Amino acid sequence: SQKSITNAVNVGTATITVEGLGTYYSGEASGTFTITPAKVEDVKVTADAKTYTGKKIKPTSFKATLNGNDVTDQFKLSAYGDNTNAGKTAGSLTIALLSGNKNFTGSTVDGTFEIKARKVASSTISVYDKYGQMVNDKYDTATVAAANLKTFTYDGKAQTFASAKLNVGNVVLETGESADTNIAKPTADDFELVYVDNVYGKSTQGATYNTAHVYAVAKEGGNYTGTKTITTADGTVIKNVVADLTFGISALKFVKENVTVKNGVYAGGVAVKPEVIVQFGGNT
């Protein structure tokens, strides 16, 4: 049976010793065998995830494994990539064998690591009329008293403001800090504006109008991400919401001028139902 193996960890010559067992076998014998270098490209490199800063990120540590065994102490960090944008494998690094290492053939191996999008806790949205005037103080249901609130009127079409924008200067990160000089300031291109429930609106208990929304949403795969998820009236789920402006849509009131009744034709003694047409602004 095997008694011992010596010098069998690193590249070189190792010795194995076996001994006899039982009544008819006694003594021991030794032999040698050679351990050859592994290929450095078979080493897997991982590094801890980092969070987007807008600046070049240097990995602070890494782990190198060969067949699941830790060989980190045989390597050093030799280079790293631009590492400025967020992504699952957006970060890159290169490790090199320490001087004099004979356990591997080759010299360097590359790896990747995740750069996480930075979370935005909140911001604000400004909306404007066709004259370029900000009208939050007329339409925003969160800040305008019901008696003074101006609403859109239902007409069967999607209701939108002349323009809307996310106030990137008001972005607050999940950590509670603003996007200051330590973090690349977000731009409007990092987000998109989405109107939701803006045809009929969504019924709101106690309100005389239905509610619709303009949401600012962090773009998928970008450097920022939202912390809120909302569900629309039709069940659509929207993730990564960073800001919301709620506005009202009032029911349409019509008068007799909006209604046309066509004459009916005798139906043989049963009640005749005339055709009734209701029109608003050319829409039936």
Predicted regions and their residues:
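Short, flexible active-site-proximal loops enriched in glycine and acidic residues
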Residues: 29, 145, 220
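Serine/threonine-rich, repeat-prone extracellular segments and beta-strand-based repeat modules
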Residues: 1-26, 67-113, 172-233, 238, ...
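Solvent-exposed, low-complexity, repeat-rich "mucin-like" stalks and linkers
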Residues: 32-69, 114-179, 250-283
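Non-catalytic terminal and connector segments of soluble metabolic enzymes
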Residues: 30, 110, 243-244, 250
